[in-house]
Amino acid sequence: MEKFTVHTGVVAPLDRENVDTDAIIPKQFLKSIKRTGFGPNAFDEWRYLDHGEPGQDNSKRPLNPDFVLNQPRYQGASILVTRKNFGCGSSREHAPWALQQYGFRAIIAPSFADIFFNNCFKNGLLPIVLTEQQVDHLINETVAFNGYQLTIDLEAQVVRTPDGRDYPFEITAFRKYCLLNGFDDIGLTLRHADKIRQFEAERLAKQPWLNNKLVG
């Protein structure tokens, strides 16, 4: 998992409340057994004018010119600012996969759905909770200024604006540690690989029958 320390990026505003996971990545794209390839279908039903299906050549599909992420000024955005209850609806880890593979490193909102919030951390996507007033300011500034950028300093736990404001945010020490070091669940486990191998060796020495193969 990629480390998150300090990130500066272009901001895109998604001025909608209650954006659910089916809007983030529609259900027909959940059939894949891979964890990659979801970025082109993030917000598929809002992003394109036609109905999307797995395996399509998305470069040939008609774009919805009214959807905010299709506007030229927000191309390459890596920070999404949106409204409350983002990521609600059904539980699907594909939602943070799609957002991350689109190019987002962080999502800022007044609140998130719990399961989506947890899934973000497991996949290196940083969800940041700010007040509604702070989100209002960021959305207004993003709309007013082309190429509006924010800096997110995870170590300091602040969002820095171009006009010199620092918006602090909360994150648990464990989640912060994992993001700063790029550790997902597998990475955390592998840090203890030597102890796991030692435990297995000691267990088999004490209980050798556990190593016997079953015969039919």
From Swiss-Prot:
Top-rank lineage group of the source organism: Bacteria
Class in the EC hierarchy, top level: lyase
Pathway in which this enzyme or protein is active: Amino-acid biosynthesis; L-leucine biosynthesis; L-leucine from 3-methyl-2-oxobutanoate: step 2/4
One Pfam family it belongs to: Aconitase_C
Gene3D superfamilies: Aconitase, domain 4 (3.20.19.10)
Protein family according to the UniProt entry: Belongs to the LeuD family. LeuD type 1 subfamily.
Protein's UniProt name: 3-isopropylmalate dehydratase small subunit
Keyword flag Amino-acid biosynthesis: yes
CDD domains, per the entry: IPMI_Swivel
EC number: 4.2.1.33
Top-level taxonomy: Bacteria, Pseudomonadati, Pseudomonadota, Betaproteobacteria, Burkholderiales
Catalytic activity: (2R,3S)-3-isopropylmalate = (2S)-2-isopropylmalate
Assembly with partners or alone: Heterodimer of LeuC and LeuD.
